[in-house]
């Protein structure tokens, strides 16, 4: 049975489909994409229009990314991440976060002691170990991580490979846990989630079994794509207004 992740990008152009939505917004710490402009769009459209939302600051994944890059000074990693959490929280407040009563800002502590999350992680690890297709996909993404975190010429050390697999599994488990277990089933992220999207497209039956659900509910919205569409519509309207103004201008005698 194939399950296609519903693309809600067109529906959310007006916000109508978000009226009853529970929205999950993961934010990568240290990712310069999340500018004040992008965060303002998240607040004014996705959060304001939703039933309720969770902004998830991915401090645990940030920790793993430091480790993958070879950083071993634990205190320095923890200090850097704490500063990044404080900076992001402060930015969100400055942009008007507190005017929205339907949103929470959380980090990994939100679910780290929940046995359901640990169960999703364990089940994913088992799937990757036992399913040859999932194993191949994992290897492919680990190879991409090697370039992303270290460059083309960095050798793949055993510890680095282990950490990259851990990053991939925990990133995927976070998405599944928040959308399918906690019920924040509309996920808004910069762009496609890679491995988790592949699982929905190619291993839906296995995911339903893994999660103990008769149907999968996650819907994904690419924030990057949505913003591009908004800018394109705005540009088109501006050109239309300019054309009308030019045509309507009276001819001087």
Where do the model's predicted regions map?
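Compositional signal for N-terminal targeting/processing segments
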Residues: 1-253
């Amino acid at each position: 049975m194939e399950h296609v992740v519903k693309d809600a990008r067109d529906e959310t152009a007006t916000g109508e489909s978000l009226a009853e939505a529970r929205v999950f917004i993961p934010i990568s710490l240290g990712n310069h994409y999340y500018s004040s402009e992008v965060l303002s769009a998240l607040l004014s459209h996705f959060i304001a229009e939703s039933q309720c939302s969770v902004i998830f600051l991915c401090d645990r994944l940030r920790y793993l990314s430091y480790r993958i890059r070879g950083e071993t000074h634990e205190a320095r990693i923890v200090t850097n991440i704490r500063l990044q959490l404080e900076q992001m929280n402060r930015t969100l407040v400055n942009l008007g976060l507190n005017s929205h009563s339907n949103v929470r800002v959380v980090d990994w502590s939100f679910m780290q002691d929940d046995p359901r999350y640990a169960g999703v992680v364990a089940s994913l690890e088992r799937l990757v170990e036992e399913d040859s297709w999932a194993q191949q996909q994992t290897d492919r993404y680990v190879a991409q991580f090697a370039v992303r975190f270290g460059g083309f010429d960095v050798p793949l050390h055993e510890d680095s490979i282990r950490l990259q697999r851990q990053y991939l599994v925990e990133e995927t488990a976070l998405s599944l846990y928040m959308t399918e277990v906690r019920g924040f089933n509309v996920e808004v992220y910069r762009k496609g989630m890679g491995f988790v999207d592949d699982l929905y497209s190619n291993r839906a039956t296995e995911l339903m079994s893994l999660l103990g659900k008769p149907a999968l509910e996650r819907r994904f919205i690419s924030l990057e794509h949505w913003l591009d569409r908004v800018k394109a519509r705005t540009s088109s309207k501006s050109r239309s207004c300019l054309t009308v103004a030019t045509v309507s201008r009276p001819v001087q005698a």
